[in-house]
């Protein structure tokens, strides 16, 4: 297992959601010790606590940083457009994600562009995890 850091926004009544809010990708999170697996294309997190802090500093005061345990961490930090919408192109999603997981990032970026995937941009230091489990809050 690998340690990663997840930045979450704090909403009304303590509801936690993804920090990169781009409808319809504003996912809600339950911090209950259970594994999150395969939400959309995986779960975004930060490989380094300092990078998570830098990103969170731009969101204050409405965020929390959580230390997490991660499964199958894929480094996508040098690819800006890293997220496709699952429903963008039927069947194309699996090919795109396969290219990311195989480390063929330039091919994945070109494939997404040609397939017309809707994209949002992941911050520097982002990793894509197949599974994520929240361990403890390290900062608010």
Can you name each region flagged by the protein language model?
Residues 1-30, 35-41, 49-140:
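Conserved NAD+-utilizing ADP-ribose enzyme module
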